[in-house]
């Protein structure tokens, strides 16, 4: 905490409280409590505002009126949202946008993989968002089904490799 307080002072942080706007899911509400506590520990007063989905969509997503929020972005190819400067977190990096156009026009899997690694590095280096945790995915399936992912990285189920065992 001391190093963080020093860094904040060096950056000229004026002590302005932050508004942490949280949608209804438990991961957001509980995560918000933890984040606010950690920020307070280094001297950043954080006001939690629990919103209903309609309020979150109107104020945060459409209105872009927030300081901090927690929301799950786990859709396939979600990285494309970072190439949209009008998206709610308003990230605007022309280098990243050009790279995403290049990725879209590339069909070679190895080249796409390398380009996506570069894109992820840009996002990480620019500190666009903080990645707090991987959502737990709980599921129940018939023992005769094979090919379902365990600990899948997205909320959707990829059924292309699923079949009934004999």
Model-derived features: where do they sit?
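Periplasmic binding protein-like
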Residues: 30-31, 37-86, 115-116
């Amino acid at each position: 905490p001391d190093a963080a307080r020093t860094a904040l002072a060096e950056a000229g942080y004026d002590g302005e409280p932050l508004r942490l706007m949280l949608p209804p899911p438990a991961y957001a509400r509980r995560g918000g409590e933890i984040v606010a506590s950690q920020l307070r520990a280094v001297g950043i007063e954080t006001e939690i505002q629990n919103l209903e989905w309609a309020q979150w969509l109107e104020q945060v997503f459409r209105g872009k009126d927030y300081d901090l929020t927690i929301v799950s972005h786990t859709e396939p190819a979600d990285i494309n949202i970072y190439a949209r400067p009008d998206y709610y977190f308003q990230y605007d990096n022309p280098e990243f946008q050009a790279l995403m156009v290049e990725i879209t026009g590339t069909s070679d899997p190895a080249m796409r993989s390398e380009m996506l690694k570069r894109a992820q590095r840009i996002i990480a280096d620019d500190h666009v968002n903080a990645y707090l945790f991987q959502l737990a995915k709980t599921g129940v399936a018939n023992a005769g089904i094979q090919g379902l992912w365990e600990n899948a990285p997205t909320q959707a189920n990829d059924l292309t490799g699923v079949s009934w065992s004999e």
